[in-house]
């Protein structure tokens, strides 16, 4: 049993460190060989589910690095499962009531594995403007991991189906069910890697910018990459170099390419992290 405290600080280029929303976070942690539990304001890196960018965009991971609520995890010899609740906002006259339930699991059998990702986002109204939007996204998938037999750092291919169920109870009153296939391939050797994600299907974010009054919910409702608004294809190619990978430090330099079937975009990323360890303020066994 332990209680952890920390401080999350963000500084944008050209801005002073304390001009952005920074927060003190703390959480309770229970740790056993197979089961872990967290409660409080929890860093997202504690999640063990590898949620695709359709669920969490780079921007969400960067600008909202903590979840507020509960995280439960079980890890066995052949797989894992986790469940969490992230309470984003309590209802007021100006703020919506919002919370996210999420889960992920995976089981391995030899070189093959099967798993799922699941989120249910409750996006309600304010005291002055009622209404609720339900946003459910599920991703069952299967994969083949050949890294060990090929003596590679990473070598895998994965195929799955992204299925959404969305209902604006007040303004629509019925579910829309966009979906599509997603295929991923990942290869890494000598700290150089390529990770490609290909999606073909419907617009997974029909209410992001909608042709009706009151339905433009944007990133407040959708946490995934906005490229999934495509009604054609979306391909994300990341080429990266990871020269430093230790328990203390990690450095990754990436060139990320986006193509939505019409236009191409380019993104550059440099991520450097230092793990200072977990200093326990309170400990009970």
What do these predicted regions represent?
Residues 25, 76-88, 94, 100-109, ...:
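Exposed, low-structure sequence patches enriched in small/polar residues
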Residues 2-88, 197-199, 203:
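Outer membrane beta-barrel
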Residues 50, 93-96:
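Short secondary-structure transition/capping segments
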């Amino acid at each position: 049993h332990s209680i952890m405290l920390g401080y999350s600080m963000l500084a944008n280029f050209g801005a002073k460190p304390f001009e952005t929303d920074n927060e003190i976070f703390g959480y309770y942690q229970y740790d056993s060989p197979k089961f872990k539990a967290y409660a409080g304001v929890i860093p997202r890196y504690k999640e063990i589910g590898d949620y695709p960018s359709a669920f969490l965009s780079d921007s969400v991971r960067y600008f909202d690095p903590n979840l507020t609520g509960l995280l439960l995890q079980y890890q066995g010899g052949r797989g894992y499962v986790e469940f969490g609740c992230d309470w984003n906002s309590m209802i007021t006259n100006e703020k919506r009531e919002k919370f996210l339930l999420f889960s992920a699991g995976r089981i391995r059998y030899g070189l093959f594995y099967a798993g799922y990702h699941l989120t249910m986002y409750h996006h309600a109204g304010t005291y002055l403007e009622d209404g609720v939007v339900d946003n459910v996204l599920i991703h069952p998938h299967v994969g083949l991991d050949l890294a060990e037999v090929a003596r590679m750092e990473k070598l895998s291919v994965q195929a799955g189906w992204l299925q959404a169920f969305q209902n604006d109870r007040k303004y629509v009153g019925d579910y829309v069910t966009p979906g599509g296939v997603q295929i991923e391939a990942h290869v890494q050797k000598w700290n150089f890697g390529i990770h490609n994600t290909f999606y073909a299907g419907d617009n997974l974010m029909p209410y992001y910018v909608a042709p009706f009054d009151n339905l433009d919910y944007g990133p407040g409702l959708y946490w995934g990459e906005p490229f999934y608004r495509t009604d054609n294809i979306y391909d994300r190619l990341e080429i990266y170099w990871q020269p430093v990978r230790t328990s203390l430090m990690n450095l990754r330099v990436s060139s990320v390419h986006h193509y939505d079937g019409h236009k191409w975009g380019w993104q550059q990323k440099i991520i450097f992290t230092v793990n200072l360890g977990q200093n326990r303020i309170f400990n009970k066994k």
